[in-house]
Amino acid sequence: MRFILVSPKNRTAYNFRGDLIKRIISCGYEVIVTGPNRVGVEKIEALGARFVEIPINKNGVNPKEDLKYQKALYELFKKEKPDVVLGYTSKPVIYGSIAAKKAGVPHKVAMITGLGYAFTAQTKKAKAIRAVMSVLYKKALNCADTVIFQNPDDREQ
């Protein structure tokens, strides 16, 4: 059985998802963690997970970069054939859920850790990003089998 954790930052995978990674491994899964670079990979691998580098511009708004990220995730999912994919934070949730659905992953989990700048700021830029993100979230969450809200108040948005 194979589980892929789609992470926007290596540090958050280790610091905030380390116990989850260990628990999933203890349940008999092979765990693969994606991240944007090789910084801190040894900590992730020390947990027993395998690491795959997939660059992501976490705060960028370039659709070409985002589609490139989604394509790289899709290719990874087709190659590794995971049983479960879990993405957390906006871009891993959006592009990971869509790619996992297209790749035929049986179980897709989206973890909304917080709404962030696009949904909390009131600038023109934030409002424009919010409009696009709302459409993308709707599509992505329709691809997910399970959606986890770390902050239940975010569910209303």
Model-derived regions: residue spans:
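N-terminal strand-loop element at the rim of the active site
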Residues: 2-64, 157
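Membrane-proximal helix-turn-helix segments that form the acceptor-binding/catalytic region
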Residues: 22-27, 71-74, 128-146
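A short, active-site helix/loop in glycosyltransferases that binds the activated sugar's phosphate group
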Residues: 39-42, 142-157
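Helix N-cap/beta->alpha junction signal
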Residues: 9, 37, 89-91, 151-153
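A short, histidine- and acid-enriched strand-loop-helix "catalytic/donor-clamping" loop
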Residues: 8-13, 57-61, 103-127, 145-146
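Glycine-rich phosphate-binding loop signature in dinucleotide/nucleotide-binding domains
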Residues: 76-83
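Glycine-rich, highly charged phosphate/nucleotide-binding loops
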Residues: 63-75
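Short His-centered aromatic/hydrophobic patch
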Residues: 87-93, 112
